[in-house]
Amino acid sequence: MIDFTEEQIQRYSRHILLQDVGVEGQEKIMNARVLVVGAGGLGAPVSLYLAAAGIGTIGIVDADVVDLSNLQRQVIHFTKDVGVPKVKSAEEKIKAINPDVKVDTYYEVLDSANALDIIKEYDFIVDGTDNFPVKFLINDACVMAGKPFSHGGILRFNGQTFTHLPGTACYRCMFKEPPPVGAVPTCSQAGVLGAIAGMLGTIQAAETLKYFTGIGELLTNRLLTFDAKTMQFRTVPVKHRDSCAICGSNPTIDHLIDYEQAACDLHK
């Protein structure tokens, strides 16, 4: 059991006051280990809110440096950070918000060679990318390792997210394989409203905190979508497919795959 300091009691007082969280829930948060893949549009708000909440360890995977075009939506990075590795920039902001948080940085591409080794160290994974090959890689690695994760994706004015727990519908239950190269425009080609990243990222952060505290109902077997133009939110039921190639009763995928695909630079 954590022996809370007076500073921690004050820092997390608004959580502790919640009947559904309390001291016990905050302790679970502070003992949690979360991996955020991508320190970009989605990874930025996720990391900031999880750090503020007191997540014990946050791992960040990103192989890119901050670009001026990132600053329109990637709020964890500042103008002074242009040219700096995103993991370094993100770590600096996380520690500034909450020095209690331990930060693990991975300045590398997540791929089939390292995904399982990295993911196994964490309790919950957040997909903060907008890159189809990596999304399928995260899904497959988490299913293989029995890890829960939050999927998120945004483009133009739209966003979508769902949460996977072992035994529930996975990304491949919805989308069997990545689309053909060039079939879906990237964010650098189609654009994205900056605030959309914050809208979806904070939902992913909330799902992460709900997972550790056991609050409410997670977005399992449901895909939440929204259109910021109309501010309409929809929840679409998603069934776990027994024939799914990775999580079905007779999986046909027994190793991780590095798909080739034009990548959206939202996470870059």
Placement of each model-derived feature along the sequence:
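Adenine nucleotide-associated cytosolic modules
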Residues: 1-268
